[in-house]
Amino acid sequence: MDLQVEKINKISGVIKAPASKSYSHRAFIAAALAEGQSILRDPLYSADTIATLEACEQLGALFQRYPDKCIVQGTAGYIRTPENIIDVKNSGTSVRILSSVAAIAPRANYTIFTGDESLRKRPMQDLIDALENLGVQISSSQSNGTPPIIVKGGFEGGQTDIKGDVSSQFISSIIMAAPYSKKPVTLNVKGTFVSKPYVNMTLSVISKFGIDFEYDTTNIPEYSSYYIEPQKYEATDYTIEGDYSSASYILAAAAMLPSNLTVKNLYKDSMQGDKIIIDIIKKMGAEVTVDDDQIHIESDGNLKAFDINLEDAPDLLPTISILMAQAEGVSKITGVEHARFKETDRVHNCAVELENVGVDVEELQDGLIIKGNPTGGYVDSHMDHRMVMAFYVLGLKIGNIIIKDASCYDISFPNFLEVMHTISEE
């Protein structure tokens, strides 16, 4: 569907941030691996997280879905052979983390993961190589390092290395499966470690489900090491916090328009890397008050140019791009070369679509240089949910924006339009 965005005058009200997509993925998987029945409170049911949930069901876990909770009967690590190929649609998190999880199935079993056209271009070779060193038989069906992925049961354990500069999901993947390996697992992360907060989130989740681990960061950023011994996940009652990634669109709208807005369910002590959005909008000129579990923002809509390294928060690239497009002066984003390996090449596509709405932009290998003054135009979403939501927010400020293939926002924020309509004043 094409979505035409109309200009509004103000953002105001009180709204609850949606549940975290990243925490929901990890909680669904941990609960599926646990011994006993877990209760997951306030989970996110979006296209991506449902892909993880349904994949876990195919691997043997039982899920009862309710609007405000999910009750999960875990497998205690006894993974079932799926009756069919597991299609995770567009969810890179699902295919990457569950490829390791599938390896803890009995040795005679095979699991095959596939997805949509975009997912079948996502790089997996670094994870494949790291898992092979742990005794896992895993391959790309096309022998090109991308899905479909074929996994044979059998996770021996031992020691392996992995590069840290492509995707933190590879690291989270091995960490989540490691407790059910036959031998202890030592995972060494080499080189630049991007998106590290996501790994910290993984460690936080598994610890809530009873997993112990050791962590050595003596020589950061050159080297990090994780050590996990064989053990079982324990069922628990777990509440999923709000999502700073999804809330970034709400906060960006409040920063670039006259506003008086409170966003609940965002925690001051959150481990989410995208929490940096608070510091960014402050430095660009918005007034922000952060309480324990909510954020209040007031703005006159006039933003200042700003330079930022988003190495640990690459999902914010589209959001920060449109904020900078509306700021006075020249801004620069660096540190996001790994964003070229997301649902799309987000660095390139942000540059192209900013130019399509009249913004002066220079594409760098690891970022963008942006000079503001957008005029509007036709935007291709590239079937990327974050592109849709970012350019929708820009449209609220300037009007005259039409977004192609806009329905994919349901990948991470199913009620995005409803929320934005609630806080918009014409």
Curated annotation (Swiss-Prot):
One Gene Ontology cellular component annotation held by this UniProt entry: cytoplasm
EC top class, as a word: transferase
Catalytic activity entry: 3-phosphoshikimate + phosphoenolpyruvate = 5-O-(1-carboxyvinyl)-3-phosphoshikimate + phosphate
Transferase keyword on record: yes
Pathway membership, UniProt: Metabolic intermediate biosynthesis; chorismate biosynthesis
UniProt-listed Pfam families: EPSP_synthase (PF00275)
EC number from the UniProt entry: 2.5.1.19
Keywords (A to Z) from UniProt: Amino-acid biosynthesis, Aromatic amino acid biosynthesis, Cytoplasm, Transferase
Superkingdom of origin organism: Archaea
Catalytic site positions: D315
Binding positions (phosphoenolpyruvate): K21, G92, R122, Q169, R346, R386
Family affiliation: Belongs to the EPSP synthase family.
NCBIfam families: aroA
Physiological role: Catalyzes the transfer of the enolpyruvyl moiety of phosphoenolpyruvate (PEP) to the 5-hydroxyl of shikimate-3-phosphate (S3P) to produce enolpyruvyl shikimate-3-phosphate and inorganic phosphate.
Subunit field text: Monomer.
Protein name per its UniProtKB record: 3-phosphoshikimate 1-carboxyvinyltransferase
Source species of the chain: Methanosphaera stadtmanae (strain ATCC 43021 / DSM 3091 / JCM 11832 / MCB-3)
